[in-house]
């Protein structure tokens, strides 16, 4: 990974951190619209970050550790309160992991 890509990725992480702080700031607000917009922005930036990490990591498996750190930092609360609908395809994938790889 060259220096430009590194700094670009670090900038994305900083931007996600700023959005996360705005989410905390607006979590008790009466406006679900603001909260929803920040959540969407955080998710878009997160998707972009993961894509950038995967495409610029020179196929190093250590990038998965960095992604894990990112998820634990910025999505830990969401993961701890996660409940899939029974018909959700993600629930089916989760079930396969639990049944076969736990």
Which residues does each PLM region occupy?
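Short, Lys/Glu-rich amphipathic helical modules
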Residues: 20-38
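Short, charged, amphipathic alpha-helical segments
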Residues: 32-44, 64-65
């Amino acid at each position: 990974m060259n220096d430009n890509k590194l700094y670009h990725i670090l900038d994305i992480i900083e931007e996600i951190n700023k959005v996360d702080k705005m989410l905390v700031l607006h979590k008790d607000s009466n406006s679900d619209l603001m909260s929803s917009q920040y959540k969407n922005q955080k998710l878009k930036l997160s998707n972009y970050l993961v894509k950038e990490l995967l495409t610029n990591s020179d196929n190093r498996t250590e990038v998965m550790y960095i992604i894990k750190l990112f998820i634990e930092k910025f999505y830990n609360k969401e993961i701890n309160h996660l409940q899939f609908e029974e018909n959700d395809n993600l629930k089916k994938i989760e079930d396969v992991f639990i049944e076969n790889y736990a």
